[in-house]
């Protein structure tokens, strides 16, 4: 039989991609018992049977169908986005001056309003945590139902469900080294898992090492003095009373931080990655300096809460002018500094604001139950909190921390977590979040961290606040995610 002169494959594919496609087709044909067709294709490709036997073919079974359905989902998303774009364009064309002014509201003063844009339902048990992708419109949520779900917050659609943990998922966070964003999760099953968003959220690594529940996990930003340069570090907090720092490229624990005498329930890094803030069941708030090399130095230990502490957050430099006034300072700290002000929430129903010397500068009272989550407004003027009293409260730091808004009637149960979408950063080094330059205006997460470390004194023209907030809650026996957006 004469050999065909037409090259199989497409010049749009690399050699490796073409090989993977050929193997997927062969595996598909084998699964359908089309042995003759498979043999003909194998002969055309000059692929020896021993180099791609039945055992190796099993790895590729279902891959072709999965890629096909992924294309269908993407086509649907494109159609939905085109439809939404058309509607938004119609709104702009028909906008009155008053409606247009509402749409162009100053983002530094925007606050979440009821009703939420979307109420996302799929989790069978309470939602414990949420996290935004730094580039795309993806949101991850973790739940006591052992799963992580990935949503498109712009469309309000469930994209996929990730399974792997064997107990409740307690925290999630996006971040990682330059050239590729990762998703980290931690669980009551004592493990931390890393997932690759660019490869259908494949579990690429599991980090064992903690001896008890792992309740908090955060990527450590890079690019500032004293911080790791590669952005490949992750910090975790556990009921074994320790904090651990991990290298996500190797999976090794590079540092164990001891000091808490009871469960440190929450940990967060400063915007430049130099400091860590931790708090928990020993009622203490601890500030750690990572600039000393192998050992983390405990710079401050703060007490004041009367019950277990559940959450903590560093204030962004945009909040320094307001918090400096609360602290009685004549001049705000320079924007280039970090760990100047902090906030903590507790089961004592209070929120405490602290300065960098360890002084409590303000106690915010208003919640009627445990305070579960805190987030500072990127513009620096507000602090948002959620609690078991089924409310979200907004505190105006320019008015001595007065509560200026309470969202009630939105939640059916306890509100467990809150996150603000990271800013859109315009940068020449932008990538699509998977290591390939796409000329996008959305920056690599590490580039974004470096840009924030350099320009965080004000809301720079290169940094655009995204007016999007996500919360997780307990609604009856199930969990729900709510999206508030401008």
Swiss-Prot record:
GO MF assignments: dynein complex binding; microtubule plus-end binding
Disulfide bonds: none
Segments annotated as WD repeats: 122-163, 165-205, 209-256, 259-298, 321-364, 366-405, 448-486
Matching InterPro entries: Dynein_regulator_LIS1, G-protein_beta_WD-40_rep, LIS1_N, LisH, PAC1-like_LisH-like_dom, WD40/YVTN_repeat-like_dom_sf, WD40_repeat_CS, WD40_repeat_dom_sf
Keywords carried by this UniProt record: Cell cycle, Cell division, Coiled coil, Cytoplasm, Cytoskeleton, Microtubule, Mitosis, Repeat, Transport, WD repeat
Pfam family, one: LisH_PAC1
SMART domains, per database record: WD40
Superkingdom as given in the UniProt entry: Eukaryota
GO biological process: cell division; establishment of mitotic spindle orientation; microtubule organizing center organization; microtubule sliding; nuclear migration; vesicle transport along microtubule
Keyword Hydrolase set for record: no
GO cellular component terms given for this protein: cytoplasmic microtubule; kinetochore; microtubule associated complex; nuclear envelope; spindle pole
Keyword Magnesium on entry: no
LisH domain residues: 17-49
Compartments in which it is found: Cytoplasm, Cytoskeleton; Cytoplasm, Cytoskeleton, Spindle pole
Assembly behavior: Self-associates. Interacts with ro-11/nde1 and dynein.
Family according to the record: Belongs to the WD repeat LIS1/nudF family.
Free-text note regarding domains: Dimerization mediated by the LisH domain may be required to activate dynein.
Function per UniProt: Positively regulates the activity of the minus-end directed microtubule motor protein dynein. May enhance dynein-mediated microtubule sliding by targeting dynein to the microtubule plus end. Required for nuclear migration during vegetative growth as well as development. Required for retrograde early endosome (EE) transport from the hyphal tip. Required for localization of dynein to the mitotic spindle poles. Recruits additional proteins to the dynein complex at SPBs.
Descriptive protein name: Nuclear distribution protein nudF-1
Organism, as annotated: Neurospora crassa (strain ATCC 24698 / 74-OR23-1A / CBS 708.71 / DSM 1257 / FGSC 987)
Lineage summary: Eukaryota, Fungi, Dikarya, Ascomycota, Pezizomycotina
Underlying gene: nmp-2
């Amino acid at each position: 039989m004469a050999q065909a002169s037409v090259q199989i494959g497409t010049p749009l594919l690399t050699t490796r991609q073409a090989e993977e496609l050929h193997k997927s087709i062969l595996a598909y044909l084998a699964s359908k018992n089309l042995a003759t067709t498979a043999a003909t294709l194998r002969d055309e490709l000059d692929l020896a049977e021993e180099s791609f036997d039945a055992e190796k073919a099993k790895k590729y079974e279902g891959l072709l169908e999965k890629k096909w359905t992924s294309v269908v989902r993407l086509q649907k998303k494109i159609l939905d986005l085109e439809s939404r774009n058309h509607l938004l364009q119609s709104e702009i064309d028909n906008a009155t001056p008053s409606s247009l002014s509402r749409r162009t509201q100053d983002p530094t003063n925007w606050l979440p309003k009821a009703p939420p844009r979307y109420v996302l339902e799929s989790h069978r048990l309470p939602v414990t945590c949420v996290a935004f992708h730094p580039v795309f419109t993806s949101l991850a949520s973790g739940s006591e139902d052992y799963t992580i779900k990935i949503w498109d917050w712009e469309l309000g659609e469930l994209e996929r469900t990730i399974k792997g943990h064997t107990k409740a998922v307690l925290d999630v966070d996006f971040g990682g080294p330059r050239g590729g964003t990762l998703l980290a999760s931690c669980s009551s099953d004592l493990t931390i898992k890393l997932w690759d968003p660019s490869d259908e959220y494949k579990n690429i690594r599991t980090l064992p090492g903690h001896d008890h529940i792992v309740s908090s996990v955060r990527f450590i930003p890079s690019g500032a003095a004293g911080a790791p340069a590669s952005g490949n570090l992750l910090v975790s907090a556990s009921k074994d009373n320790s904090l651990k720092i991990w290298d996500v490229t190797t999976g090794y624990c590079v540092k164990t931080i001891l000091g808490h005498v009871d469960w440190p329930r929450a940990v967060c890094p400063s915007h430049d990655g130099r400091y860590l803030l931790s708090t928990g069941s020993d009622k203490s708030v601890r500030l750690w300096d990572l600039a000393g090399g192998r050992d983390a130095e405990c710079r401050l230990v703060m007490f004041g809460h009367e019950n277990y502490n559940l959450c903590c957050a560093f204030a962004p430099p945009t909040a320094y002018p307001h918090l400096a006034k609360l602290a009685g300072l004549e001049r705000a700290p320079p924007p280039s500094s970090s760990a100047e002000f902090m906030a903590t929430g507790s089961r004592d129903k209070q929120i405490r604001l602290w300065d960098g010397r360890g002084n409590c500068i303000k106690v915010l009272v208003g919640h009627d139950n445990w305070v579960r989550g805190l987030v500072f407004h990127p513009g620096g003027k507000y602090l948002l909190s959620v609690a078991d009293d089924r409310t979200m409260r907004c505190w105006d730091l320019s008015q001595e921390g007065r509560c200026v808004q309470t969202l009630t009637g939105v939640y059916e149960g306890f509100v467990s977590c809150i996150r603000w979408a990271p800013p859109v950063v315009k940068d020449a080094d932008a990538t699509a979040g998977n290591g390939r330059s796409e000329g996008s205006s959305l920056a690599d997460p590490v580039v974004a961290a470096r840009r924030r470390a350099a320009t965080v004194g004000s809301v720079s023209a290169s940094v655009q606040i995204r007016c999007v907030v996500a919360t997780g809650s307990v609604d009856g026996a199930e969990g729900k995610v709510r999206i508030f957006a401008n």
